C-alpha cells in the first residue's frame, strides 16, 4: 500500500536544490575558493624579500646557490622520468581486458552506469556526442546519461531539445551562479546521478565502444580501495597542423607511458579531465569536485590519494579534438597550469598532514608531479637564455656562476636531460604507432617554449583572476 504525503520521505533532488559548492562549504581547507592562506602569502612574501636582499648583498653567491639548486632539481626530475618510464613496462601498469573476456561475461546483468557530459556553448557537438554515447556497447536501460547545460546557454539548449534523446538520456539545466566552471556543473550531475558507477566525458569525446564494460570489469577485479580507473586519451585530428602533431605526441607520452608508470608505482595520479570512471558512492563521500579549481581532475586525484584510495589505468581510449589554433591552445594550457598551481597551494596548506596522509613516497611523487612540473616550465626560459648567451658570447660573468660540478651536471641536463624528454615523446609516438609524428616530436623544444609562455601567464592569472575558466574552443577540425 502506498503512503501519501509521508513527512519522512525526502523530496526528489533537482538541479536547484543541491549544493554544487559542498566541498568549499564543508571542507574549505580542501578547496581553492581561497587560493592562498594568510600563512602561505606571508611565507611567499618573506621568501621573495629574502631573495631580493640576498641578491643585493651577495649577488654572485646568491646566483651560484640558486643555479646549483635548480641544477640539482633538473637532475632529480630527469632521473624521476627514467624511473616512471621504466615502471610503465610493468605488466600491472595498466588493466587490460580482451574482447573475448568481455564476450565471456554475457549473459549478465550490468550495473547502472551514470554518464555526465558538461557542455557550454557547443551546439555543434551535441548531436555527435549523443550518437556516440548511444552507440556504446552497453545495455540501453543501464545508461543514466546527463547532458549538463547552463540555463542561460540558449544555443546549446536549443540544439539538445531539437534532438530525440535515446532512453536514459536527459538534459540537466545548471542554474547560473558563480563560479562558472565545469566542476560546478559536474557536482550537480553527481547529486542527481543514479548509477553505481560514473564517468565524465567532454563534449567532443569519442570513447571506444566497450569502454563502460571494461570499466565495470576493472572495478570488479580490483581491490576495494580502487576508486577510479582512468582511460587513456588521444586525438582524432593529429595531422591537422604542427600544433596538433606536438599535442598528440605529448598526450601519447603522458597517457600511454607516464600515467601507467605512475600507476605501477602506486603514485598519486593527476586525473585527466575526461574518461575517468568512479565508484559513485566514494565520489559522493568526497563531495565531488572543487568548483573553484580549474583543474578539478588533478585536485580530485590528490584527494583520492589522501583519503586512502587508488587510481588504476585502463587500456581503452577516448578520442578527443586536439587544439589546432595557437591562442586556443595557450588559453587551455594556461588553465591547466593555473590549476596545478591552485592544487599545489591547496594541499600544501598543512605539509605535515599531507605527508602523513600520503606517506613519504607519495608525498615526493606529489611534489615532483604537481610542483616540479610547474616549476620547470617557469625556470626553463632562464636557463635556455643563459645557455644561449654562454655558447654565443662566452661572457666571463656567466662562467663564474657555474663551478665545475654544477657545470658538469648542468651540461648533462642540457644535453642528456633534454634528449630524455624528447625521447619520451618519441616513445609515445611508437607506442601509439603514429610513426609519422616522430619527426615532429624532435621539434618538441619549440613546444616547450609555448608551455613556458602559458606557464607565466598562468602565474599572473593565479594572482589576478584565479577562478576564470578560459574555455577550449571545439569544432575546429578541418572537414575533408
What are the roles of these predicted feature ranges?
Residues 111-114, 144, 284, 299:
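Cell-envelope/extracellular polymer assembly enzymes that use nucleotide-activated donors
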Residues 79-142:
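N-terminal signal-anchor transmembrane helix
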Residues 134-177:
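Acidic donor-binding segment of Leloir-type glycosyltransferases
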Residues 294-300:
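Acidic donor-binding loop at a coil-to-helix junction in glycosyltransferase catalytic cores
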Residues 162-197, 209-294, 334-345:
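Long helical/loop segments within the catalytic core of UDP-sugar-dependent glycosyltransferases
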Residues 52-99, 103-105, 368-464:
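Membrane-embedded multi-pass helical conduit in multi-pass membrane proteins
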Residues 202-206, 289-292, 304:
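The conserved acidic donor/metal-binding loop of glycosyltransferases
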Amino acid at each position: 500500500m502506498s503512503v501519501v504525503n509521508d513527512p519522512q520521505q525526502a523530496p526528489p533532488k533537482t538541479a536547484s536544490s543541491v549544493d554544487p559548492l559542498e566541498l568549499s562549504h564543508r571542507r574549505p581547507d580542501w578547496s581553492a575558493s581561497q587560493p592562498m592562506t594568510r600563512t602561505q602569502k606571508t611565507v611567499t612574501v618573506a621568501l621573495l624579500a629574502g631573495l631580493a636582499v640576498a641578491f643585493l648583498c651577495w649577488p654572485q653567491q646568491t646566483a651560484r646557490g640558486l643555479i646549483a639548486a635548480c641544477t640539482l632539481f633538473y637532475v632529480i626530475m630527469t632521473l624521476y622520468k627514467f624511473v616512471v618510464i621504466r615502471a610503465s613496462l610493468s605488466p600491472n601498469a595498466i588493466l587490460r581486458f580482451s574482447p573475448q573476456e568481455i564476450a565471456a561475461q554475457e549473459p549478465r546483468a550490468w550495473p547502472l552506469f551514470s554518464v555526465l557530459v558538461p557542455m557550454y556553448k557547443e551546439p555543434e557537438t551535441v548531436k555527435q556526442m549523443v550518437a556516440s554515447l548511444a552507440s556504446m556497447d552497453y545495455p540501453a536501460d543501464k545508461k543514466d546519461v546527463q547532458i549538463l547545460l547552463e540555463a542561460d546557454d540558449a544555443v546549446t539548449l536549443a540544439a539538445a531539445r531539437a534532438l530525440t534523446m535515446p532512453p536514459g538520456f536527459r538534459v540537466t539545466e545548471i542554474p547560473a551562479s558563480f563560479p562558472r566552471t565545469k566542476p560546478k556543473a559536474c557536482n550537480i550531475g553527481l547529486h542527481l546521478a543514479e548509477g553505481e558507477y560514473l564517468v565524465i566525458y567532454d563534449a567532443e569525446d569519442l570513447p571506444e565502444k566497450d569502454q563502460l564494460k571494461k570499466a565495470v570489469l576493472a572495478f570488479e577485479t580490483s581491490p576495494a580501495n580502487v576508486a577510479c580507473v582512468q582511460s587513456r586519451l588521444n586525438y582524432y585530428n593529429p595531422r591537422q597542423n604542427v600544433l596538433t602533431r606536438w599535442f598528440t605526441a605529448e598526450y601519447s607520452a603522458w597517457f600511454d607511458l607516464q600515467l601507467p608508470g605512475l600507476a605501477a608505482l602506486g603514485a598519486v595520479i593527476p586525473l585527466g579531465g575526461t574518461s575517468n570512471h568512479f565508484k559513485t558512492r566514494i565520489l559522493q563521500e568526497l563531495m565531488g569536485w572543487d568548483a573553484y579549481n580549474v583543474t578539478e581532475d588533478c585536485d580530485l586525484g590528490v584527494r583520492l590519494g589522501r583519503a586512502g584510495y587508488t587510481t588504476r589505468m585502463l587500456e581503452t581510449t577516448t578520442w578527443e579534438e586536439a587544439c589546432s589554433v595557437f591562442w586556443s591552445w595557450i588559453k587551455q594550457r594556461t588553465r591547466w597550469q593555473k590549476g596545478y598551481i591552485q592544487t599545489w597551494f591547496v594541499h600544501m596548506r598543512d605539509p605535515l598532514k599531507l605527508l602523513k596522509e600520503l606517506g613519504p613516497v607519495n608525498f615526493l611523487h606529489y611534489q615532483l608531479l604537481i610542483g616540479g612540473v610547474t616549476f620547470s616550465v617557469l625556470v626553463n626560459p632562464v636557463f635556455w637564455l643563459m645557455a644561449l648567451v654562454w655558447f654565443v658570447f662566452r661572457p666571463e660573468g656567466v662562467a663564474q656562476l657555474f663551478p665545475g660540478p654544477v657545470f658538469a651536471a648542468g651540461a648533462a641536463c642540457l644535453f642528456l636531460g633534454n634528449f630524455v624528454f624528447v625521447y619520451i615523446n618519441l616513445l609515445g609516438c611508437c607506442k601509439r604507432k603514429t610513426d609519422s609524428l616522430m619527426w615532429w616530436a624532435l621539434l618538441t623544444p619549440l613546444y616547450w617554449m609555448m608551455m613556458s609562455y602559458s606557464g607565466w601567464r598562468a602565474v599572473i592569472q593565479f594572482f589576478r583572476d584565479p577562478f576564470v575558466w578560459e574555455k577550449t574552443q571545439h569544432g575546429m577540425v578541418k572537414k575533408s
